[in-house]
């Protein structure tokens, strides 16, 4: 399996966990029927199709991504859901959008503007503002928290403190560039009428096989490289709880419950 295919599979699996929170976010935005929007950093189109459903048959959503391979998969998503007339996909970068001023009624972007030492969010946000009509909105969202190991809060806190789980937030980045400070970014980009919300997606036993696989993948994605950051005893406990072949595999518990959150930051173009 290629790196592209592996990452696409990860996105598909994790979507079973994320989609309820993102649907709630879309509902809160109350996107006007018939409006035209941009999904900036659309990946394989999983959110683009939800947005296209929300704006209805007279609306339209353009998905933008750097990866032509992801865009091809996004087109398949739209085709499968019968939404090809309401969606289009274009290659491009969020820092230099290939669209005219005042093209869209709104922009939506999920897990795309995480700052790094080499890339800050403001240039992309200014581009979002440029392509949105006056009175339109810009909404950016981030996976902001999760609790996946019920009954083991200290172990989960230690695992979460491992650098691999904190990525893409990196040591050396100014505190105001943490994604939970995104209202400040929106204000600096010239947006007004700012608001922020957090949405929860939760799962509980009995788990479907798809959700089990998504959680197993999430355990590995967050904590699979944390061994050097925790004690040998903590790592042994992690493996006891999070390895599917363990007699104490946590997903086999009849009382298993977990949740994740997405935080949305929204502003209006003057």
Where are these regions (language model features)?
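Conserved catalytic/acceptor-binding region of the Class I
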Residues: 139-207
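Conserved alpha-helix/loop element of class I SAM-dependent methyltransferases that forms part
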Residues: 16-33, 50
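A short SAM/SAH-binding and catalytic strip from SAM-dependent methyltransferases
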Residues: 105-120
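A short acidic, Gly/Pro-enriched loop at the edge of an enzyme's catalytic core
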Residues: 95-107
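Short glycine-dipeptide loop
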Residues: 57-58, 132-138
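Class I SAM-dependent methyltransferase SAM/SAH-binding core
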Residues: 38-40, 44, 48-96
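A short glycine-rich, Lys/Arg-flanked "PGG" loop and its adjoining helix->strand segment in the class I
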Residues: 122-134
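Conserved Class I S-adenosyl-L-methionine
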Residues: 180, 195-270
